[in-house]
Amino acid sequence: MSRRHAAEKKVIPGDPVYGSVVLERFINKVMLHGKKSIARKIVYGALERFAKRLGLENPLEGFEEALENAKPILEVRSRRVGGATYQVPVEVAPDRRSCLAMQWIIKHARSKPGKCMEIGLANELIDCFNKQGATIKKREDTHRMAEANKAFAHYKW
């Protein structure tokens, strides 16, 4: 058993435009090399494009809906039992759900062709909002893996 105390979670203040903690975490994930102002410009620009294309009045609500659609419920974790490694399906913790969804959205937005991250991010958010695209496919693949390995669910720890 560990003798150390659990690490304290940092409290992140909300972003300056919408006051949302979730959006500020998303901005932090988009940020590269400590350039937060550029990350903010990219995210706010993408949100404006996203809201304009879908005809939403509040881009934050649409963003939260898109993020909710991308969150995985189950995932598989490797568990070694007697020389064999099993992929054990486990439920994803709420913080990890949103973290994984953000990572997947950003990863697929960066992999889109073209130079402008703002446009790629807006397109990926639109796809998530409409429950389609690469991020949703990744979520479905994760769920499919968990479903396929349901037989090993009794190895949970």
Curated annotation (Swiss-Prot):
Top-level taxon: Bacteria
Q: Which UniProt keywords apply?
A: Ribonucleoprotein, Ribosomal protein, RNA-binding, rRNA-binding, tRNA-binding
Coiled coil region boundaries: none
Under the GO molecular function aspect, what terms does this record hold? rRNA binding; structural constituent of ribosome; tRNA binding
The answer to whether the entry has keyword rRNA-binding is yes
Gene Ontology, cellular component aspect: small ribosomal subunit
SUPFAM superfamilies reported in the protein's UniProt record: Ribosomal protein S7 (SSF47973)
Query: InterPro entries of this UniProt entry?
Result: Ribosomal_uS7, Ribosomal_uS7_bac/org-type, Ribosomal_uS7_CS, Ribosomal_uS7_dom, Ribosomal_uS7_dom_sf
Query: Biological process (GO) annotations?
Result: translation
| A Pfam family reported for this protein in Swiss-Prot or TrEMBL | Ribosomal_S7
Say which family it is in. Belongs to the universal ribosomal protein uS7 family.
Q: What is this protein's name?
A: Small ribosomal subunit protein uS7
Gene for this chain = rpsG
